[in-house]
Regions:
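Residue-identity detector for glycine
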Residues: 211-212, 225
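Accessible peptide chain termini
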Residues: 1, 224-225
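A polyanion-binding, active-site-adjacent surface
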Residues: 1-199
């Protein structure tokens, strides 16, 4: 299949990219993304963290565990099912480094985001996902422009693909300390879950086919959290 081969070639090119190292933006290239041909969901994050730099798997640290819990709340049978059905990438493909205080990660430099943008654009063109899950302010702004999380989370935008914004699952974020914002998160997860329920078995089968046989899964409805 031409699209599948094009995706594999694109992924190989991304893994070998070292443009930001050559330009002195970062000291080490560690492009991180994950996904299969046919995935109906596409999640866009900000940038890998230090855990992801080592594992080379998106959202594999503490924030990723929280994201997995959110997706089970949304209606995926398990975190594994969520990741089978979702292509996960970021605005910046490599770890941007720690901040000077050592208590958090640097925001992706605009030049690095610009360097990486063609990877994201090509993935979206090839995969044609049905739903984009936008995690964090930077990813949301990339597709929807500047705006407050309060005005974005809990709503859907565009069609197709439908875009659903989420806050970042980092434990450093205080946004979810507000009960009203937790309700917004629940509403956003419900939108994701409603779409999950509409997926035909054939769509799930196609997204599973690149990684070996999988048993069929049932979707759960969103729960309050």
């Amino acid at each position: 299949m031409q699209g599948r081969a094009e995706l594999f070639a694109l992924q190989a090119g991304c893994r070998g990219c070292h443009v930001c190292v050559d330009e002195g933006i970062i000291p080490e290239a560690n492009p991180t993304f994950e996904g299969r041909w046919g995935a109906p969901f596409f999640l866009v994050g900000q940038a890998p963290g230090p855990v992801e730099r080592e594992s080379r798997r998106p959202f594999s640290g503490r924030a990723g565990k929280e994201l997995d819990r959110w997706m089970v709340r949304a209606g995926f049978e398990s975190a594994d099912e969520f990741r089978r059905l979702t292509y996960i990438a970021a605005l910046m493909r490599c770890f941007p480094g720690r901040n000077r205080a050592g208590n958090g990660d640097l925001k992706p430099p605009p030049k690095a985001v610009a360097n990486c943008s063609h990877w994201l654009d090509a993935e979206l063109r090839i995969l044609k996902p049905k739903m984009l899950i936008l995690v964090g302010q930077l990813a949301i702004a990339r597709f929807l422009g500047p705006g407050r999380l309060e005005d974005r989370v809990g709503r859907k935008f565009g069609d197709p693909p439908v875009m659903v914004p989420l806050p970042h699952p980092s434990g450093q974020s205080r946004w979810l300390n507000d009960p009203a914002n937790r309700q917004r998160l629940t509403a956003a997860l419900a939108l994701i879950g409603q779409f999950r329920l509409t997926l035909a078995p054939a769509s799930i089968s196609r997204s599973n086919s690149d990684g070996g046989p999988d048993k069929p899964h049932r979707a759960r409805r969103v729960t309050q959290g």
